Design a protein with these regions (language model features):
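Catalytic beta-strand/loop signature of glycosyltransferases that borders the donor
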Residues: 170, 210-218
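Membrane-embedded multi-pass helical conduit in multi-pass membrane proteins
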Residues: 251-333
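Donor nucleotide-sugar binding loop of glycosyltransferases
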Residues: 40-43, 66, 89
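N-proximal low-complexity "stem/linker" segments adjacent to membrane-targeting elements
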Residues: 1-50
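A conserved acidic beta->alpha catalytic loop
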Residues: 63-71
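Acceptor/aglycone-binding surface of glycosyltransferases and processive sugar-polymer synthases
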Residues: 84-99, 104, 116-194, 198, ...
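Acidic metal-phosphate-binding loop of nucleotide-sugar-dependent transferases
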Residues: 112-113
Length: 333
């Protein structure tokens, strides 16, 4: 890849380890603007024009078989259009990446809520060696851009993500992303729907993708544009995804949380059986068996969680060593 600007060394701290990066200017020709859409005829033209006005002419619209004129308008405004073969935003993104022939992707929604003027600052960290950038909508959000229920749900999900997966990405549900194609190829993504942003964040943690957050503007949807998001249903799916994805990223939490619940339930039932037997002379043999099973299951799940966490930690350490050796080898070439 040719350099389009001067290189210089920058240093940042990552988890107490000093990491050095080559700094370079990323040219617009190296970037594909990816816009997943579904029935966005009211806004897609202005979104495409906004990115093109800022020099990003390589725009790929991946459309979920819209019933309106989204595709026609996108073509009229100079974008390439891909009709996804499956359903859901996650599947659309995975399929679209197969048609990207440049090293960097800038992803946004086609509803006009994200500002194309933020494109340069989204891409700037990639020039410093980061592999994935998340745009933080809460840094500069219009007052009417998010309903109160949606805002509460977003903050709850971000806190749950920090607690379960141990990283603070500020706004994991943001659809404004910039990333390298190489880092995307390392991620194991299965989500088809709106849980794709959650899965991206979890996979960045699990795979050790160098990720940072930048502030972006977030505006309200135009009145003529309708959202495809269902807050209760999709919010529930996202919470379940956070827990499910902990299986391979934080197995101690995944198995331990169920183990603690089973253990406490078993102890509670055992206490009830003991009190009834001592003070009332009533024996509950079946409940005693249930209590013993709950305690045994809880202990086993906790032990399994600890062992799984040790394996995951060892795997991460081996991966870091391999990546360090690879970097040193490439540096000497």
């Amino acid at each position: 890849m040719d350099d389009d600007g001067a290189r210089s060394k920058t240093i940042h701290h990552d988890g107490g380890v000093i990491v050095t990066h080559d700094e370079r200017k990323i040219s617009a020709e190296e970037v594909c603007v990816l816009l997943p859409t579904l029935d966005e005829e009211a806004t897609i033209g202005d979104v495409i024009d906004g990115f093109r006005d800022h020099g990003y002419t390589n725009v790929l619209v991946v459309d979920g078989d819209s019933s309106d004129r989204t595709r026609e308008i996108a073509r009229e405004h100079g974008a390439r259009v891909l009709i996804q073969s499956g359903e859901g935003k996650g599947q659309a993104i995975r399929e679209a990446l197969e048609y990207v022939d440049v090293p960097y992707v800038l992803m946004a929604d086609g509803d006009g809520t994200y500002d194309p003027a933020d494109a340069d600052q989204m891409l700037e960290p990639l020039g410093r060696g980061y592999e994935h950038v998340i745009g933080n909508r809460f840094a500069n959000m219009d007052d009417d851009a998010m309903r109160r229920l949606n805002g509460f749900g977003n903050r709850l999900i971000n806190r749950a993500f920090r607690f379960i997966h141990g990283a603070n990405y500020a706004d994991i549900l943001s659809g404004y992303r910039a990333f390298t194609v190489d880092s995307f190829d390392r991620l194991s993504l299965d989500s088809d729907g709106f849980t794709i942003e959650t899965e991206l964040a979890v996979e960045c943690v699990r795979q050790g993708v160098d990720t940072t957050v930048v502030p972006v503007s977030y505006a309200a949807r135009p009145d003529e544009s309708e959202t495809n998001l269902h807050p209760i249903k999709d919010g529930g799916n996202i919470i379940l995804a956070l827990y499910s994805l902990a299986k391979t990223n934080n197995p101690l939490f995944y198995f331990g949380s169920v183990g603690v619940a089973a253990l406490l339930s078993g102890i509670g039932v055992a206490a009830y059986v003991l009190i009834r037997s001592v003070y009332f002379g009533v024996n509950h043999e079946i409940l005693a068996v249930v209590a013993a099973a709950g305690i045994l299951l809880g202990v086993q799940l906790l032990m399994f969680g600890v062992l799984s966490d040790m394996i995951v930690t060892l795997h991460r350490e081996q991966r870091r060593r391999l990546e360090r050796v690879t970097r040193e080898f490439n540096r000497k070439k």
